[in-house]
């Protein structure tokens, strides 16, 4: 309760102020009159409650929602059970289960890997939110399976766990792959097991006398499959013969290789890929990265032809160089990549070469696997008998083009179009397409476009025409993404606009010269200055 004296004093002050004439302050100085038409009403801008502060608890900080197992594909073998991964615990609260395993489906004969009826595809383990990815169970067949290799122990310095081991597939003799540690060591590859003798390891290279660096060791072949030993690769910089890579029997594509892919087995071997490759690579190539012929001097990249094989192998499947069964793209000046023939008893179809990219619709030379129709631009798929004579080189023509639709700046151009804004032709874009389709960043392939909008990850990247639509899923991907990543508050898109209330003295939208720049705040400041000057 206020003191009576204070109350009387306040009343007296109000009375004195009321007795002053209009436009006159207490010390006698003139004040700038404020017309009633320019006086802003004292309105309070009430902003709605912050969206992030009252977020839906059902999506706050949870893991990826669980997916039902893949129904599989019809066949003649037994269905493989898809393992279910443990629930994700990423976030402040335990969320629903991680991705469910993909089951093989009844008799999902994954023929084509030497297939035949009854070769089921084992289930894929689910993926937890972080950090581990369970192993791949391999391919089941008629021979004993390889035991799963022990997972790596991770790295004590980084504190990250290793990857679990991957088991081999029965019948195929694929060896077990050891887990990959977080850093820095990688486990070895044990070779391929089968019924035939192992190939001797090729001699390691001797290095290069000019560089002073040692060469790489030779690799031995695997038993039964008849892969020859791989010779070591020199440190680079020297003679064309420094690359000690004997190649595969029947494979005539690379210089320094002998034979090709005619692998000893239970059925007649495949012949060499046709047409036969030239003895040397053409010297023409991209500036600064030419592929010299086998007899030429080191090119501008400082490597001889044999040492350039490593670069060629790294590039040939992204469409930047090579030659083979598919003609090169018109106008690119670069050759295509070589074709691969199948091996006996495995039923691998031949791989067509990939052109350098950029030109005609036929530049995409990867015919795929017969019976497998999941990837765009591929024909045929995996309906290959495994015990019958080997498959020849794949011959079905590819689809005319990839769908032109894609993210702005990273579109998948058609095979007949010019290089897109990402600077790559359709053939080179295949690499990007394959890399993206399993992480949900494109609508092509086996992952539906609505993947982003169901799970909110990866974050939606707006295109030139604005953010992509919700696709009718009823799920707010942006809200989920913000909650999932940060778990903090996400301001409402209307809160900022609502907090700035318009006033009567606002400058008109037309921005005319007659608009007044005087504001109540400026008038008050002028009055204060005038009062101070008068007091002096």
Swiss-Prot record:
Record's compositionally biased regions (Gly residues): 209-220
Domain of life: Eukaryota
GO biological process, alphabetically ordered: terpenoid biosynthetic process
Protein's pathway: Secondary metabolite biosynthesis; terpenoid biosynthesis
Species name: Aspergillus calidoustus
Further remark: In A.calidoustus, the austinoid gene cluster lies on a contiguous DNA region, while clusters from E.nidulans and P.brasilianum are split in their respective genomes. Genetic rearrangements provoked variability among the clusters and E.nidulans produces the least number of austionoid derivatives with the end products austinol and dehydroaustinol, while P.brasilianum can produce until acetoxydehydroaustin, and A.calidoustus produces the highest number of identified derivatives.
Free-text function comment from the UniProt entry: Part of the gene cluster that mediates the biosynthesis of calidodehydroaustin, a fungal meroterpenoid. The first step of the pathway is the synthesis of 3,5-dimethylorsellinic acid by the polyketide synthase ausA. 3,5-dimethylorsellinic acid is then prenylated by the polyprenyl transferase ausN. Further epoxidation by the FAD-dependent monooxygenase ausM and cyclization by the probable terpene cyclase ausL lead to the formation of protoaustinoid A.
Ranges of Low complexity composition bias in the record: 195-208, 287-302, 408-423
Parts forming coiled coils: none
Entry keywords, A to Z: Signal
UniProt protein name: Austinoid biosynthesis cluster protein W
Stretches the record annotates as Disordered: 141-164, 185-220, 261-302, 385-423, 491-536
Signal peptide boundaries: 1-19
